[in-house]
Amino acid sequence: MAHKKGASSTRNGRDSNAQYLGVKRFGGQVVSAGEIIVRQRGTHFHPGAGVGRGGDDTLFALTPGAVEFGTRRGRRVVNIVAAAAAE
């Protein structure tokens, strides 16, 4: 069993594409309906009031307003509060 694979052979040349995950709109930022708030794998953040969850666990705004991060029952949640109430 050769451990040297021979001339013109390499074990390198693999790299995965970037996933572009993370928080896209931070607390206090005003969003419109449909805007992506968090891209994630799994539910690191859970949807709260005015927030929907996509099939890939992406959180997005269902209503216009300001983004608010908080906790509920020990979970990190993202809510949308009315823009007038946020000011």
UniProtKB/Swiss-Prot annotation:
Keywords: Ribonucleoprotein, Ribosomal protein
Entries under InterPro entries matching the protein: Ribosomal_bL27, Ribosomal_bL27_CS
Top-level taxon: Bacteria
Keyword Calcium: no
Any GO BP: translation
Alphabetized PROSITE patterns for the sequence: RIBOSOMAL_L27
GO molecular-function term, one example from the UniProt record: structural constituent of ribosome
GO cellular component: a single term: cytosolic large ribosomal subunit
Family statement: Belongs to the bacterial ribosomal protein bL27 family.
Name the record gives this protein: Large ribosomal subunit protein bL27
Origin organism lineage: Bacteria, Bacillati, Actinomycetota, Actinomycetes, Micrococcales
This protein's encoding gene: rpmA
